[in-house]
C-alpha cells in the first residue's frame, strides 16, 4: 500500500487517481438536477483532481518518452490567455462531455467532427490510468525522484506504447478543441504578426538612432514605450517602410489582423503623412513620444532627417538686389525684388492650389502642342518654377548611405548671388519649403505676365529641364514618397558620382526654409509634376550647354533679354563659385540619363541662343508620347486629392494635432483589442533591442590588495586572503582615504635617508618614507623638512596630534631599524593567530588571541611612536611643526575562515551571526563583541564594535595616550 507522504511520481499518481475515482463515483450516485449545489461543488473538485492527475501523467511522460513526445509547436498560435496551467484539465473535461454526446454551444458542427476524437482520447486515457496503477503496485520505490520500472516486463512496454498513443491523440484534440473555442491564427496571419514584430523592432532602432528614445528606457523596460513604439511604428510603416507589413496598397485580407480593422483610417493617415516635410514629420514623431506642445519653428536637432544648419541662411532681399544692377529695365528690376519679398510673406495655401491648376492646364495643353507650340513655353515655364518638381530625386532615406545628396540647382525664387556656399547635404525627404517659395513666384509671375517674353520662357524651360537631369543623382521616372523612403536605397543610375560640386548648397534656398516652416508643403503634387516632366523630356533636350548645377536663377533673370541675362549669369558664377564657364556649345550626349562626371559639373543653366533652341523644342514636343497625357491625368488627380486633403487644415499645428489624435487612437486601440498579441510583440522587441548583458565578473576569494589600495608591494604583505575588511558597511569611513600627512623632522648637514616600514605592521603596508634633506646655505643647526613621500591610504581624521619635529641622529635611525625588525616578528605572530581561527580548543584560541593582542602591532606602533616623540621632545626646536597621522584598520578575517566565535568557540548558525571587531579584525558572536569604543588611531572618532578584550585594552591604552598627549601639550606650552 502506498504511503500518503510518499513523494515519488507513482505514489503521487496513485493517490490523485484514487481521489478522482472517489469524486466521480459520488457524482454518479445522485441526480445532479435535484441537488444542483452539491453537483456544482463536486464538479469543481472533479476538475481539480483531473488537473492533478494529468499534471502527474505529463511528468511521467516527460521521463519515459522524452524526445518521443508529440510536438506542440501549434501553441505559438494560441492566444496568451488560453495557455494556462489548467488547460489539460479543461481539455479532459471537454473530451468527456463530447464523448457523452454533449455539444459545444454554437459549435454544433465542430462538436460533431471532434466527437470521435474525444472518444478516442477518453478511452486512451482510461487505459493509461489502469496501466499506471499497476506499476504503482509493482515497481514503486518510496520517495524516489525517478521511475524504477522493469524494462524487461511486458507491462512496461505496453505502458510505453499507450503513453505515446495518448500523447498524440491528446495533442490533436488540443488543437481541434482550442481552434473551435477561440480564434487561432492561420499560417499567413502568424507570419504577418512576425513581420509586425520586425517593423516594431526597426522602428525602435530608428527612434534610438535619431534621438527620439533612449537606450536606458529600453533596458529599464519603461512602460511608456508600450505606447510610444506602436505609435511610431504606424508612422514608420506608412511612410518610411512603405513596402512593409503596413503597405496599404496590398489587399485588405493580406494585412495583419491587428491593423485590418483600421485600414481606411490608415490610408488617410498615410496621405496626410506624405504631405509633411522633414521638420513637420520629426515634430509629429516627437509629439507621439513625449506629448509635448507642437512647435514647428524649433530646429530639428538630432534626427535622421537632417535639417539645414542656421549658418546657411541668408537674406534673400539683399541677394536679389545685388543682381539688379545689371538689369536692362527698371521695371524688370522692381519685379525681381517683389518676387523675393513675396516668397517670404505670401501664404502657401493659395499657391498650392494654383500649382495644381497649372498641372491641369499643362495636361490640357499637351494635346495641342503640335498646332500651337508658342503657348507651351508659358505653361511649362510656369510649371517648372518649383524646385521640388525637379529635385525630389536627390532625396535620400534616413538609413541611406552617408554620401551627400546633390543640391537642387534650379530654384527660381532665389538668386545667383548667394551669401555662402554650403557643402552640407540638403534636407532629406521632400523639400516642402522650396515648394512653397516657388509657388509664390508663380503668383508674382501671374501678376506681372508682361514682364517676360516667349523667347525667355522657351530658353529657361529647356535650361531647367537639363538642370534637373544633371543635378539629380537619382533618376526616378515613376515614384512616390513611399519608395523614396525605403532603407538602403541605391542610385538608379550608373553615373552617380558625389562630386564636390554636388555638395554645394544654396544659401538662398536654405534661408527660405527657416522662414516658411509654417507654410503647407505639397510633396505629392510636386512628385506628380516631376514624373510628368521626366516623361516629356526627350534625348534631344540634353543638347543644351552645360553649367554649374549649384547656380540658382533669380526671378528677374526670366524677365530680361537673353543677352543681358546671360551676362549676369556668367558674372554671378564667376563671383560666387569661382569657376570659369565657356559660352560655347558642348558636345551632345548620346543618352539623356548617362551624363559623365565632367558633364555633370558643367550642366545645366548656362544660356544658349533662342533661335537654336526653338526648332529643337518644336521637334521634341511634336514627337511626344501620347500615353503621357493619360498617365499625367492620374498623377494630377493624386496630387489634387492629397493637396486638397491638406488644404482642409488651417495651419500646420492643426494638421499635426489631427495626425496625433488619429495615430494615437489606432495605437491605443491595439492595447485593447489585441492586448495579447501586442504584449508578445513588445516582449520580443525589448529582448532583441536591450543592451547586451554584462558578463558576470567572478570576484576571487583572495582579492589582491593592489586592486583596493595603493601600496608598495614587499615581502611583508600579509593576510591577502582577508581583504574583506573593506567590504564592510560599518567601515565605510575606513576605506575612503583622506589627505596624506606630511611629517617634519629636523636634520643636520649630513644627507641621510631611511625607509621606515612601520605601516607594514598594520597589515595594510602603510609605507612611510623619512628622508633627511640638507638645507642649502643653512647652518648646521638649521632644520630641514623630511616629507612623507608615500603613505598608502592614510587616514587622517585628526584626533591624534603627534609632534614629530626634531633633529634626527644616527642612533635614532638605528633604533627605528630595530623597531622594524620587532614589528615583523609581531606580524608573524598575528598571521599565526589568524590561521588558528578554526581551532576547536578554546584555551589555545584564547591564549593565542591574548598573546597576539598583547603583542599587537597597534600597540607596538603606538609605543614606538610614543618613544619617538619622547626622544624627539628633548631636541625639539622652537620652529618645529606638528602634523597628524592615522593608521589603517586591520584586515578582517573572512567569514568562511571563521566557523566559530574566536572567543567562546560557539559555532555560527543562521541565527547566530558573525561580527567583526574593528580593532583586531577577528570574528566574534554578538555576545563576545557587544562592546563599542572609538578608535582614533584608525580615524574612527565614533564608537564602533569591538570585542571585549580589545575594549579593555583600547580603553586602557587610550587613557595612557591621552595622558602622554596631555603631558606633551603642557611641555610644549611651557617651552
Swiss-Prot record:
Chain positions with Phosphoserine modification: 540-541, 796
Zinc finger regions, FYVE-type: 895-955
Positions with biased composition (Acidic residues): 430-458
Compositionally skewed regions (Low complexity) per UniProt: 302-352, 365-376, 383-400, 408-429, 621-633, 802-860, 877-890
Cellular-component GO terms for this entry: early endosome membrane
Binding site residues for Zn(2+) 1: 901, 904, 925, 928
Region (Disordered): 299-458, 504-523, 556-633, 740-891
Protein name: Lateral signaling target protein 2 homolog
Gene source species: Drosophila sechellia
Lineage, opening ranks: Eukaryota, Metazoa, Ecdysozoa, Arthropoda, Hexapoda
